[in-house]
Amino acid sequence: MAVRPIRIVGDPVLHTATEPVPVGADGSLPADLADLITDMYDTMDAAHGVGLAANQIGVSKRVFVYDCADERKKTTRRRGVVINPVLETSEIPETMPDPEDDDEGCLSVPGESFPTGRADWARVTGLDADGTPITLEGTDLFARMLQHETGHLDGFLYLDRLIGRNARSAKKTVKSHGWGVPGLSWMPGEDPDPFGH
């Protein structure tokens, strides 16, 4: 299908909760959803991401794709799509995030990363591309991805979770790049890779 531009922090679609994907009485999904999911995979792959929410490409639908290892620096990955996800987590630590273990980035904040507090365990329930109910759960990096992508669909970026000096640093970084305004995007595969993959 197609690689689509990824919206950058400040675009209203990233800061607004997405709409659930309608499911028919027979469990059927909208006919155009398959093309959207294919475009999301293509875009995530071109950007070398571990996840991508639909609103990151400007579509306000409650769906995300992922291609993520369970732990950092592991090569075995899980790949799939979750439609209308519902998130459940363990308690989020109230301590300052560790600069190494809790570092998090985002394709909508290209090239930047900040320590972000997240729960150690997460579970998401939803539907797969065929409309079949699924449950995903994990710890470490996979749990972080589940929380990150579901947060996107709720209208939040990981920057919204930052505290203390990390929040101040992120605000300065966004301002220095000229982000935080509507209409900015980058094109995976055409623009330079902001994360250096």
Swiss-Prot record:
- Residue stretches spanning the membrane: none
> Which PANTHER family does this UniProt record tie to the protein?
PEPTIDE DEFORMYLASE, PEPTIDE DEFORMYLASE, MITOCHONDRIAL
User: Catalyzes what?
Assistant: N-terminal N-formyl-L-methionyl-[peptide] + H2O = N-terminal L-methionyl-[peptide] + formate
Q: What is its EC number?
A: 3.5.1.88
The cofactor required is: Fe(2+)
Q: Describe the task this protein carries out.
A: Removes the formyl group from the N-terminal Met of newly synthesized proteins. Requires at least a dipeptide for an efficient rate of reaction. N-terminal L-methionine is a prerequisite for activity but the enzyme has broad specificity at other positions.
Q: How is the cofactor bound?
A: Binds 1 Fe(2+) ion.
The text of the family note is: Belongs to the polypeptide deformylase family.
Keyword terms: Hydrolase, Iron, Metal-binding, Protein biosynthesis
Any idea which positions bind Fe cation? C106, H148, H152
> Catalytic center at which residues?
E149
Instruction: Report any one BP term from Gene Ontology.
Output: translation
Q: Return the SUPFAM superfamilies for the record.
A: Peptide deformylase (SSF56420)
Question: How is this protein named in the record?
Answer: Peptide deformylase
Against CDD domains, the record matches this protein to: Pep_deformylase
> What is a single molecular function from GO for this protein?
metal ion binding
Metal-binding recorded as keyword: yes
Pfam families, per database record: Pep_deformylase
